[in-house]
Amino acid sequence: MTADRGSGESHGSVRPPVALAFASMGFAALVIFGLGMTSLATGEAVIATPGLGQVPGIAGVVCALLAFAGALWAAIGRAEERHPSFWGAAWTTAASFLAYIGGVWLGALFTGADLGVATGVAGRLATSWFGLAVAASAFVCAWSGIALVRTRARRPRWPWEDEYDE
């Protein structure tokens, strides 16, 4: 994982597929944590509509994770040819947020809710602290994934590890 691979590659010390895996796992963990802590802090359920069950929430997180991975890969996938921009974090955030809202909406429809209830649940999430928790999680993890690819840092070395030391 160090930058001195000897092949002359121009990307950072972490390859794009590895950065994508780390950032995606971090996003999944952080979005679940963020939704739970937001629920604890506000005293409200993430999906407060009775009878919907867990399917809309699961569908929303799965859709958000897939959108996150796709958008982040679009930002960092060709790092050998170009330097990835941190603007990719903004696009990844937008894609993840919209996919979460859309996934919850589709999940609510799948569980048998009518169109008005599904739209109400999705609208509440989009305009509440829960939507902000999803967007913030996506932004932090996308920024981190891009930073992993952009960095030119190498692993730390102690003075006695220098092979040219006398």
Language-model region placement:
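Cytoplasmic membrane-interface segments at the C-terminal ends of transmembrane helices
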Residues: A3-V18, L66-T93, L109-A113, A138-D165
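Alpha-helical protein-protein interaction elements
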Residues: V14, A19, M25, T38-S39, ...
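Alpha-helical transmembrane segments
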Residues: L20-V31, A142
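Transmembrane alpha-helical segments of multi-pass membrane proteins
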Residues: F22-G26, S85-G102
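Hydrophobic H-region at the start of alpha-helical membrane spans
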Residues: G26, V61-V62, A95, L132-S137
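Membrane interfacial helix motifs at helix-loop boundaries and amphipathic/re-entrant anchors
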Residues: I32-V62, G103-A133
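Lipid-exposed faces of alpha-helical membrane segments in multi-pass integral membrane proteins
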Residues: L66, A99, G103, A136-S137
